[in-house]
Amino acid sequence: MAVQKENDRELIVDEDTLSEVINESKSGSPAAGHAVSDYFGTDEIFSRVIASADEEFGKSKRLLYFSGVAAGLSIGLSFLARAAVAAEVMPDGSPLIANLIYPIGFMLIVLGRYQLFTENTLTPVTLVLTRIASVPMLLSNWGVVLAGNLTGALIIGLVMATSGVLEPEAAEVAASFGEHGLSLPWFSLFIKAIVAGWIVASMVWLVHAAQDTISRIVIVFSLMFLIPTADLFHCIIGSCEAFYAVFR
């Protein structure tokens, strides 16, 4: 509560009301930068990330694992869709057209709240940094989610390689994705994966800063499009591509 004096009288003003008044000028635009209400502050975003991490740690290992499997299957859709579109537009079309469909699996994961290992490099770590959770708990969480993601990637890679779901041209393109990753030196692949992981972690932070679904979709699309365009490798999609190349 804030106390103001007017004509020798004390007026008690509710802080929420005061903030609302400050936040609007006569033109309807914010009167001060720090009073813009449709932006979360850094502390608020961090608190939202912690809340999400706390929810993850509260889940059973079984639920966490199957959520990870769902994420692995969903992210395989990025691999499948990119290969199918690339086969249609190449060699005459630009690979950027196929890269536009790459974020689709990440959209499913973000909107469906599935557990993806690279997302978990940010959210659960916040609980360790704030000493709410221990390092062994973090490693256990990572292990369960990674196992689930790899299971999903293995399933989708095996199904795509053995079921004939892809046309011959698309199957060749899909195989080239996996072979390209397997042909790179391990250190180069490692660095590319780290950069891709950093992009995903940035996406997670910005998704928690967004206030509506449309904003989240735009964030996911804008950042995930960078991964194939910059020839980076996401560890789970890369695993799916490698499984496909091996089983084919």
Task: Identify the residue ranges that each predicted region occupies.
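Alpha-helical transmembrane segments and their helix-helix packing motifs
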Residues: A2-R248
